[in-house]
Amino acid sequence: MEEVLDLYAEPPDPQQPLVCLDEKPVVLHAPTRPSLPSSPGHPARIDYAYERVGTANAFLLVAPSVGWRHAEITERRTHTEYAHCLRYLVDVAFPQASRIRVVQDHLSTHDPSSLYATFPPEEAHRIRQRLEFHYTPVHGSWLNMAEIEIGIFERGCLSRPLEGLVDLCQRTAGWEAERNAQRRTIRWQFTTPDARKKLARLYPDVKSELD
C-alpha cells in the first residue's frame, strides 16, 4: 500500500509518467422492439425491454497528473488483450518516456509474462524494459486511481443499453475525446502518513510482538 501511496505523492515526471490501469467487463443489451420516434403531439416512445446480445471488456488507462485517459474495448479479457494495451502505452501514448510506471491490481493476466505469451521474445523484452509495475494490495483496489475513471466511464457510456460492440466502441471514442479535451486531472490526497493513522489496524503490531 505504501509503495503506491508514495508513488502518488511524487511530483510528475514527463520522462517517467504514472499510468493507472484497470478493466471492467461490459454486458451488451439491445432493445427487443424498436423505439417509436416522436410525432406532433406525441413524445418518442422507448421500449424498456432488452435482451443480452453479448459481452465485452473495457481497459481503462489513466495518467492522473496530465489529464490523459484511454479506453480500449476488446471482445475478450485475456493476456493477449492486456499485452496489446501495454504496447499501446509504450509505442503510442508515451513513446518519448524513458520508463512508464504502471499501477494495477493482481489480476492473473496483469503480469509481464503476458507479453511473452503474446509477442516474440525480442518484442516482449523491448516493451518490458520500458515498464515498471506497481501493484495495489489484495482487497485494496480502491487505491487504483483508474477506478475513479471507470466510474465516470460507466456514467458516460454504460448508463444506456448498448446495441452491440460497435455501439460501445463509438460511445467510448466520443467519451474519451471529450474527457481528454477537458484534461481533467486527479489529485490524490490520501497519503502514507494518513494510512498509518487511519488504517493502523492493517499494520502488524510490532510493539506487542516485542513485549
Language model features: what each stretch is:
Residues M1-R87, L199:
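Extended, low-complexity cationic-aromatic segments
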Residues V19-L21, R101-Q104, H134-T136, Q189:
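Short beta-strand segments
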Residues T32, D167-A177, A181-D211:
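C-terminal domain-tail junction helix/linker
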Residues R45-E51, E123-M145, R160-E163:
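RNase H-like polynucleotidyl transferase catalytic core
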Residues T80-R101:
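Short, basic/hydrophobic alpha-helical segments
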Residues A97-D111:
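Acidic/histidine-rich, metal-coordinating catalytic segments
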Residues V138, A146-G164, E178-Q182:
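Active-site proximal helix-loop segment of RNase H-like, two-metal nucleases, encompassing DDE(D)
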